[in-house]
């Protein structure tokens, strides 16, 4: 392993005589390229990215709260919001944080920057493992998505980035959840990131086991723009769509060690992945510096995964109470607390505060309800 290889070098060994370790990662998504950009932190390592040919994916906006381990992301942040809102039929709760603003970056820009840094640091790209000509001692990690069974909870969405007249949007406040939309198919909310007073990303997002027809999401966006935001004249400049499995899943290939979502990086209750992938990689590299072998584990604490399992059970069986759940949480927590909880940085006191904000009976029933994907 890396630590063992490093410890075997003698003081008189020249750089040319040092045996480099070969590491390959299958897939060229967020996790593998984020690690590749930091390959200089892996001593005496040749990193190979296995990138089979596949269609170019559309751009996406990734959202997260600013945290210490995300400092390297800051130069690519498209927009920061120190205020964000959770809106139900009964309340509009605006939270704010000076230290942990909500932020957004472009998927394409992040991956391009990581790839550029990786190439500068000698990372090589191949279309197959065979093409990499790895020796038998090479370590292989798999970033392909984990295995997902039918019927699991999904976060699925369609988004429009729109341009409207100046003054159409309040770009000081991100709308994380606006539940004033059709709830007939499951937990459903509108997510709006205003990049300026005329440009915004609006997503129709659902948490449910089944996806809806495209027209359902598109109508929800149009209705929200026209009836809630009072924006009827706009151009769609970009579209995005996606589906993220929520739960606890087996690795893509049980014979290979995982990285990223294939090593438990995706937060089961929210689908947030980008920030947690960076945390996972940070921890792995800290371990390497401490003399441990490179290894990727879930960045989530066991108690948070336990709480996530209960939450997913509630939302699966009683989606109609989702507005009440998130409205209560937003009203009881400060902006900093909200950001820390959803970023996996909660204290026990904060977790208790969240639990006490929840409706008790649905969560008690979920506590004793068996779920097939429980951790």
Predicted regions and their residues:
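N-terminal Rossmann-like FAD-binding beta1-loop-alpha1 element of flavoenzymes
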Residues: 11-48
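N-terminal FAD cofactor-binding segment of flavoenzymes
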Residues: 34, 38-90, 109, 158
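Predominantly flavin-linked oxidoreductase catalytic cores and closely associated redox partners
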Residues: 117-235, 247-252
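FAD-binding beta-loop-beta segment adjacent to the flavin cofactor pocket
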Residues: 184-187, 241-259, 314-320, 327-334
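Short FAD-binding loop at a beta-strand-to-alpha-helix junction that anchors the flavin cofactor
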Residues: 192, 253-269
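Flavin-binding catalytic cores
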Residues: 210-240, 257, 278-302
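A conserved FAD-binding loop/helix module that cradles the flavin
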Residues: 262-283
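C-terminal helical "tail/cap" subdomain of flavin- and related membrane-associated enzymes
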Residues: 282-375
């Amino acid at each position: 392993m890396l630590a063992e290889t490093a410890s075997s070098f003698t003081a008189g060994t020249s750089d040319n005589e040092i045996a480099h370790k070969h590491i390959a990662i299958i897939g060229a998504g967020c996790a593998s390229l984020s690690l590749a950009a930091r390959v200089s932190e892996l001593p005496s390592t040749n990193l190979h990215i296995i990138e089979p040919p596949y269609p170019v994916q559309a751009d996406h906006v990734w959202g997260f709260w600013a945290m210490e381990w995300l400092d390297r992301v800051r130069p690519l942040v498209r927009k920061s919001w120190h205020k964000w809102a959770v809106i139900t039929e009964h309340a509009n709760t605006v939270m704010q944080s000076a230290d942990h603003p909500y932020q957004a970056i472009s998927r394409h820009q992040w991956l391009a920057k990581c790839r550029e840094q990786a190439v500068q640091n000698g990372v090589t790209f191949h279309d197959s493992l065979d093409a990499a000509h790895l020796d038998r001692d090479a370590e292989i990690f798999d970033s392909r998505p984990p295995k997902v069974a039918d019927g699991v909870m999904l976060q699925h969405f369609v988004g429009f980035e729109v341009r409207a007249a100046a003054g159409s949007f309040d770009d000081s406040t991100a709308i994380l959840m606006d539940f004033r939309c059709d709830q007939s198919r499951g937990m459903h909310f509108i997510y709006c990131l205003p990049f300026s007073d005329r440009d915004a990303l609006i997503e129709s997002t659902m948490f449910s086991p089944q996806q809806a027809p495209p027209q359902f999401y598109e109508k929800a966006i149009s209705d929200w723009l026209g009836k809630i935001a009072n924006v009827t004249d706009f151009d769609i400049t970009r579209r995005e769509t996606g589906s993220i499995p929520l739960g606890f899943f087996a690795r893509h290939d049980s014979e290979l060690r995982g990285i990223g979502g294939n090593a438990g990086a995706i937060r089961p209750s929210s689908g947030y992945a980008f920030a947690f992938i960076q945390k996972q990689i940070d921890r792995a590299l800290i371990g390497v510096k401490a003399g441990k072998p490179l290894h990727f584990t879930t960045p989530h604490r066991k108690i948070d995964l336990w709480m996530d399992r209960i939450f997913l059970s509630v939302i699966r069986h009683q989606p109609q109470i989702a507005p009440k759940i998130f409205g209560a949480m937003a009203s009881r927590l400060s902006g900093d607390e909200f950001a820390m909880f959803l970023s996996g940085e909660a204290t026990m006191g904060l977790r208790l505060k969240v639990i006490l904000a929840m409706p008790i009976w649905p969560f008690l029933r979920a506590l004793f309800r068996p779920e097939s994907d429980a951790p």
